[in-house]
Design a protein with these regions (language model features):
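Conserved N-terminal catalytic core of the sugar/cofactor nucleotidyltransferase
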Residues: 33-99
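Short beta->alpha linker loops
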Residues: 53-54, 74, 78, 147, ...
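Conserved beta-loop-beta/alpha segment of the NTase-like Rossmann-fold superfamily
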Residues: 76-146
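N-terminal glycine-rich phosphate-binding loop and ensuing alpha1 helix
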Residues: 2-52, 59
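Short aromatic/basic micro-patch
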Residues: 25, 109, 143, 183-184
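Hydrophobic residues at beta-strand termini and immediately following loops
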Residues: 26, 70-72, 132, 175, ...
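Conserved alpha/beta core of the MobA/IspD/sugar-nucleotide pyrophosphorylase nucleotidyltransferase superfamily
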Residues: 2, 6, 150, 154-194
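Short glycine-rich anion-binding loops that position phosphate/pyrophosphate groups of nucleotides
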Residues: 12-14, 54, 75, 105-108
Length: 194
């Protein structure tokens, strides 16, 4: 099977939190470093981190890790521009990628095991989309097979993965990720997980 890469979206300005959540410490490392390390452990290749606000600090925090940083100057436009930026970078590094996982950086319980399970579902289910299920919804991370790269590259505004999951429900396999409901947007969220 062709390689599966990952795009980790880390461009936001964490407006509700008031400081870069990408750099919050959880389990002895930053949230972003945790997700990067789990992606590397799962043998996802390449690992592309999309930055925007706080680009310099985020780049510095990942020094020494074998990742590619893709800066999105249009980060304030929403998630779609980050996905497009990451996909362009990923395909320049791995033109024959069979799939890409789009991940956010504020789900502290993401694991290499979850990433591996998504890749396995992609390989065995016959489906080209693999989404995580939690709290009665489908959400991130989401794996997109290469047949969806063209559609991904046309996303705009605040559109993210959910748009495609709704448009192509017959092509979606799911992986349970109950901890996916837990993400960090506020100080209260952070206190709850510590």
């Amino acid at each position: 099977m062709d390689k599966t890469g990952v795009i980790i979206l880390a461009a936001g300005d964490s407006s509700r939190l008031g400081r870069p959540k990408q750099l919050l410490t959880f389990g002895g490392k930053t949230l972003l470093a945790h997700i990067v390390d789990e992606a590397l452990e799962a043998s996802l290749d390449p690992v592309v981190v999309v930055t925007g606000a706080y680009a310099a600090a985020i780049g510095e925090s990942l020094k020494g890790r074998p990742v590619t940083i893709a800066h999105n100057p249009r980060w304030a436009e929403g998630m779609a521009s980050g996905i497009v930026t990451g996909l362009i970078e990923l395909l320049s590094l791995q033109p024959s990628a069979g799939g890409v996982i789009v991940s956010v950086c504020d789900q502290p319980y993401l694991s290499a095991g979850l990433f591996r399970e998504m890749v396995q579902q992609f390989g065995t289910s016959g489906k080209s989309l693999v989404a995580c299920s939690y709290g009665g919804i489908l959400g991130t991370p989401v794996l997109f097979g290469s047949r969806y790269f063209g559609v991904l590259s046309t996303l705009s505004g605040t559109q993210g993965a959910k748009k495609l999951l709704k448009e192509y429900p017959q092509d979606v396999a799911t992986v349970p990720f109950p901890e996916g409901e837990i993400d960090i947007d506020t100080e209260e969220d952070l206190k709850r997980i510590k």
